Amino acid sequence: LMDLWQRENVDTTTVLRDTQAPTGMYFVSHDAQGHHFSYARAGSAASRMQPQDLTHWADSIAHSQWLHLSGISLAISASACDTAFAAMAQARSSDTRVALDSNLRLSLWPLARAQACIRHAVSLCDLFLPSLEDMTALTGLTQAQDIISWSHAQGAAQVVLKLGAEGALASDGHKQHQIPGHMVQAVDATGAGDCFAGNLLARLSADDDLWAATAYANAAAALSVQGYGAVAPLPTREAVLEMLHTPSKGTPA
C-alpha cells in the first residue's frame, strides 16, 4: 500500500505503522448477482486505532480541506469508531469539512449498532454520501427524496445520494440536481463508491460546485466499473473529461 500511494504521489509522511498487527484485507468473488466480499479484518492495524492517536494527525486534520470517513471506519472496531468520532469533532473545530460515505457492511457489525453509529456520524458531517441500498437497510426508506430529507434532518448540509445505474441525486438543502447515469459495459463494481467519493472530494477541493463535482464523480465511477478490481480500472482525468463530453453507449452502470 505504501508503495502504491507513493507512486500515486500521495503524501505518506503521517501514516502510522503497527508492527504488531496485519493490514486488513478483503476478498472479492463474482457471480450472476454481482460482487461479494469476504473480510480478514479482525485485529488489523486499522482496527487498533485509538483516539489518542489523533495527536499524531492533529496538524494534518487542521490543515486539510476535507476529512473523509466511511461506515467501515466506524465498523471495524469500537476503538476505531471512537477515533473516527473524535477526528470528526476535531475537524469541525478546525473548519475542516467532513465527508462520510455510508458504506454499510453488515458482515462487520450488527444492524442496530450500525444504525446508531452512522446516524451520529451523519450529525457530524458536512457532506453525506449514502447509497440507496444502504439507506433502505439503515432507515427503511426506499424513496430518494425521503432519504435526502432524512440526511439533512440529521445535520448533513450537503447530500449526494448514489443511485447506481441511475446516477446520483445531489442536494445542498435548498436545491437538488439529478445527475443521470452513463451507459457503459459494466463488469465489476468493486471500488466504484470509493472512486466516486475520491473524485467528488478532489473536484470540490479544486473549487468545483457540488453539481459539477457530482457530475465528474459520476462519470469517473462509471468508467471504473469497466474493469476488474478496485485500483487498476481507476480512470485518468482525461478519460473522465472525454466521457463527460461523449454520448453514452452500452448499458447503464
Where are these regions (language model features)?
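Conserved N-terminal subdomain of the carbohydrate kinase-like
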Residues: 1-71, 242-250
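Short, hinge-like loop/turn segments at secondary-structure boundaries
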Residues: 3-7, 31-33, 115-118, 146-148, ...
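Conserved beta-alpha-beta core of the PfkB/ribokinase-like small-molecule kinase fold
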Residues: 66-150, 166-168
